[in-house]
Amino acid sequence: MPTIKDVMVAKPTARQIADCSKWPIWTCGVSKFEWEYTQTEKCLILEGKVTVHDPGYPNQSVSFGAGDFVQFPDGLKCVWNVIEPVKKHYDFE
């Protein structure tokens, strides 16, 4: 089973930015919620700040924000803590 350590955060390439611009947009206000990925998700964070952690281990976390390209693996269970309202392009594989 994937863990938070399997979440990849990087600065996007020019190609990734161009590809992401065709993807749908998702927005979320400041909140905290549990999420389970049933597919791999790739996203480009346009606005906001988020910390995601394993449900039982809040000290094992990853943070990302505007300008980051993030990939979440299929099967990951996590808790999203949206610190600043988030807007992202996203795609599921």
Task: Please give the residue ranges for each predicted region.
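Transition segment at domain starts
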Residues: 1-18
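Conserved short histidine dyad/triad with adjacent acidic residue
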Residues: 10-11, 19-38, 64-66, 71-74
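Short hydrophobic/aromatic-rich beta-strand segments that constitute the beta-sheet cores
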Residues: 35, 52, 88-90
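Short alpha-helix capping/helix-loop boundary micro-motifs
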Residues: 36-38, 55-59
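Short, conserved beta-strand element in jelly-roll/cupin
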Residues: 38-52
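Short, surface-exposed secondary-structure edge patches
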Residues: 42, 60-61
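Ligand-binding loop in jelly-roll beta-barrel domains
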Residues: 74-93
